[in-house]
Each structure stands twice: as structure tokens, then as C-alpha cells.
Amino acid sequence: MNYQAIRAALENPLLTAFNSLVPAVPVFFDNITAVPANTTTEYVRINITFGITNEPTLSSSVDNARGALIIRIFTEKGRGPARNQTLLTTAVNVLESLNNTAKPATGTFMRLGEINGPTFSSTDEAPHFVGRIDTGWVATVLT
């Protein structure tokens, strides 16, 4: 199983989209970076979980895996939901484009399920307004 290829298929398009915004929005992944402590700036936190990673196939040249993708958008609290919703729209557009990508002959083929959310939350203590979406995914690594 090629976990890094699956992560890259999800992470790279999201990272590119948020880095292309003006100003660029920092993205933190659960596998390589940590969110800065006590930050009041906006940022995106992406978590990828693996569920079934040994789904049987008819060929040894194909690996199938399933899991979940959770995207949290953190924006400055007290400024309204508009910026958070704009960043969530960026994430949703990327996820929808992944479902419209043709199946390659080699590499990683990714399909996402229904997108849940957005849901919004904030606490009295935290400096952020948080928007969240999540979805299940199915990946096929073709060799």
C-alpha cells in the first residue's frame, strides 16, 4: 500500500489552492506540521485518516484504500462568517474537481463521497471562528 501517494493525491491540490489565494493561507497537515500555538491568523488544518487499507482486488497491481478527509478552516473571530465561508468554498471546489478527474493508467485514482457540512463553531476562549467539512474517500493506487 502506498500511503504517501494517497496522501499526495488529496493534499497537493488543496495546498496548491490555498497557496494560490491572495494572501496565501497557511495549510497544516496532521502528518508533517503542527499548528502554531496561540495564533490569531487564519489557517487551514487538514486531517486524513485511513480506514480499510487491505481491500481485496482481482489483481496484485492494484491497491484499494478507504478513509476520511476532515478540513477545518480557522478565521479571525468577531469578523463574521464571510471569510470562513470563502475559504470553505475553495476547499469544496478542490474536492469537486477531484471527482471530475479522469482515471489515469498509473498513479492514484481518487473518488470522494458526499461532503458533510459546513458546520461552524467557536468558543469564548479561542481566537478563531471554525468552519468544518468532511467526506469519505476511496483511493486506488494503480501500478
PLM regions and their residue ranges:
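Short, charged, solvent-exposed linker or helix-capping segments at domain edges/interfaces
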Residues: T57-S59, R83, T143
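Acidic-leaning, charged glycine-interspersed low-complexity segments
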Residues: V92-T143
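Oligomerization/assembly interface segments of phage tail-like spikes and tubes
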Residues: S61-R79, H128-T140
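Small/polar-rich, solvent-exposed N-terminal microdomains that initiate assembly or binding
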Residues: M1-S61, L98-T106
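Residue-level detection of beta-strand scaffold positions
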Residues: L14, I48-F50, R66, L88, ...
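Mid-chain, well-packed structural core segment of small domains
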Residues: F74-V92
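Conserved acidic
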Residues: N2, I6, R83, P127
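Short, well-ordered turn and helix-capping elements at secondary-structure junctions
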Residues: F50-N54, K77, N116-T119
